[in-house]
């Protein structure tokens, strides 16, 4: 007498029960807005060393836009302004 036993779904996949019972709301990171967009946003200028130095790391490298939340267009302008300021010796290429 062979009986076929159908296993319960929760016994086969314990992760399925965990997601159903202890389901949490997923964490949504707040979308950052570009610091150079908006009505009173600062203009990117190679002579504004204080503004440009905010977007440089401790080593003098340009910080990527995924960290600074700068839009792609403004990141290109920012990189160009930083490179221009470096060329004119307003900003250092590297920091020791």
Curated annotation (Swiss-Prot):
SUPFAM superfamilies: Ribosomal protein S18. It comes from the Bacteria. One of its GO terms (cellular component) is cytosolic small ribosomal subunit. Keywords: Ribonucleoprotein, Ribosomal protein, RNA-binding, rRNA-binding. One of its GO terms (biological process) is translation. InterPro entries: Ribosomal_bS18 (IPR001648), Ribosomal_bS18_CS (IPR018275), Ribosomal_bS18_sf (IPR036870). GO terms for molecular function: small ribosomal subunit rRNA binding; structural constituent of ribosome. Gene3D superfamilies: Ribosomal protein S18. Binds as a heterodimer with protein bS6 to the central domain of the 16S rRNA, where it helps stabilize the platform of the 30S subunit. Belongs to the bacterial ribosomal protein bS18 family. Part of the 30S ribosomal subunit. Forms a tight heterodimer with protein bS6. This is Small ribosomal subunit protein bS18. It comes from Gluconobacter oxydans (strain 621H) (Gluconobacter suboxydans). The gene is rpsR.
């Amino acid at each position: 007498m062979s009986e076929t036993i159908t296993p319960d779904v929760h016994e086969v996949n314990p992760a399925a029960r965990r997601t159903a019972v202890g389901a949490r709301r997923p964490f949504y990171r707040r979308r950052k807005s570009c610091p150079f967009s908006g009505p009173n946003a600062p203009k990117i200028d190679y002579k504004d060393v204080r503004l440009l130095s905010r977007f440089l790391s401790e080593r003098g490298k340009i910080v990527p836009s995924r960290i600074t939340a700068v839009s792609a267009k403004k990141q290109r302008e920012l990189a160009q302004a930083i490179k221009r300021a470096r060329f004119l010796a307003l900003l250092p290429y590297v920091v020791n």
